[in-house]
Amino acid sequence: MDDLVKFDIKEVKCDLLRAINECSQRGLLHTTKWLAELNYSLKDIKLDLHEVTADIELTESSEEDDTYTLAKTYFDLKEYDRAAYFTEQCTTPKVRFLHLYSRYLSGEKKKIDDMTDVPPDPMKNDGLKLLCADLRKDHSAGKLDGFGLYLFGVTLKKLQLTREATDVLVESSHKQPMHWGTWLELAALITDREKLESLRLPNHWMKHFFMAHMYLELQLIDEGLAMYCELQSMGFEKNGYVLAQTAIAVHYRRDVDNAIETFKRIIKEDPYCLDNMDTYSNLLYVKEMKVELADLAHRATEIDKYRLETCCIVGNYYSLRADHQKAVMYFHRALKLNPQYLSAWTLLGHEFMEMKNTNGAIHSYRQAIEVNRRDYRAWYGLGQTYEILKMPFYGLYYYKQAQLLRPHDSRMVLALGEAYEKQDKIQDALKCYYKACNVGDIEGVALIKLATLYEKLGEHDHAAAAYTDFVMDEFRNADRTELSHAYKYLTQYHLKREQLDRANHYAQKCLQFDETKEEAKALLRTIAQKRAKVEESSMVVEDMNETDPVIDQAARTDTTPGNQLSPMNLSFTPTP
């Protein structure tokens, strides 16, 4: 992390200007845009432009320049077959790349045009296999530069040759570290921190953008957020990508309001930006901010109604309005534009779940996992779907995968605990509920699950301890039925143990609920009778108004289970 601060910002800007030129010449439009936005963030950094432009103009000049100029115009107009045809005999790295890349994009375009509801099998793509064979031949002959290696890695990845693809993409990152597309393709192949740390990556400042991206992908939120803060301090504090990644990191830390404010800042800086606005729409959906989501959908449609992000935003808008048919239509539209669009597959699965179309949900979630195996939402969705289908063993497997990806998300841990409980794996369920308490119970149900399970097991001391912790935050616990049951249980528990002050306190609480009001009256009568007997036998009259039994609880040294056991202090050791 420390070496981030030592970067020569002028050198960074020079690298950006050179890379923008190189990527633009090769038709790598998304990377060109990404680099240009980074460069714009450094617009106040002054350079000797004569040196920079002279360096850029020293590109190779060859007899293929006229062919390149013609082919590049065809490429820019998406006439990929024509571009590939006219460059077939070219051998210089730049024009050769344009030929191979045109063939690749032609195949991708035709695949999308011919796509049905079932995505095509990449292993049956003869054009892709032929392209990969040509790239392999060039690679063996040492003819591939950093950009050619990138394309070779992409084709290997498409053909599911994962290990070879990883090696080739790492090689590409050494030869051309400024190509962001290479880093993103490599990121999709990394499944855990161990694999990330085993890679031999170039010692280049772009590596830090990649590492920050990977930290978020691997749910290493604190490291990722710290690195993005460092990048902002380098001069990228207004860069839309860095801000969006920061918002995503903040969202992962469950600070949705702060994440929304960060996206509002991005819109203020760049009002026509649609990049990452699908993520923003997800946050508005979670917070049920209908007006803001409607405004975002309207604005996105006006900017570009056929953008992936727009389709996703409008789909979320209709989903929030419970118009699931229209939501499905827009998510399908997004997938028609890009079958690898992860967010749309996951959201489509959610919509099918709402429509009780379990087959559609399973297919969508599986496709999301094919695109990115780290998408915990898809694993979690599959767990829910198989639960509905009364297939608990499948559900348990998918919940385990979701929990491994999000080990500190109480929702994943709770779902796993419930799955264990349904299969009578009680000790595993208890561990999960304790874990959910320890990591911060988002939904506020872990304690009640723990208490209820202990009550079923007849472990009354443990149950009372959990119920005691549960009722201490009664304003958070909105479910009146659960709260009233907890108060009734604690009343009966303390009554059996002749702890009349506490029993009286909880019985008074029971009077506030219609469900327990009558029972509370009966319990209070029992408490009064017991008190009378105590007074008769001991002839001691206590002034009940002097102390509040609950406030005074900490000062007493009795056997109250809340003092013996706190679920929040136990550790979690999952069963393999």
Give residue ranges: language-model regions:
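Residue-level recognition of tetratricopeptide repeat
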Residues: 63, 92-94, 145, 179, ...
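Position-specific recognition of the canonical hydrophobic site in helix A of tetratricopeptide repeat
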Residues: 75, 104, 157, 216, ...
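Conserved structural position within tetratricopeptide repeats
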Residues: 140, 173-174, 233, 265-268, ...
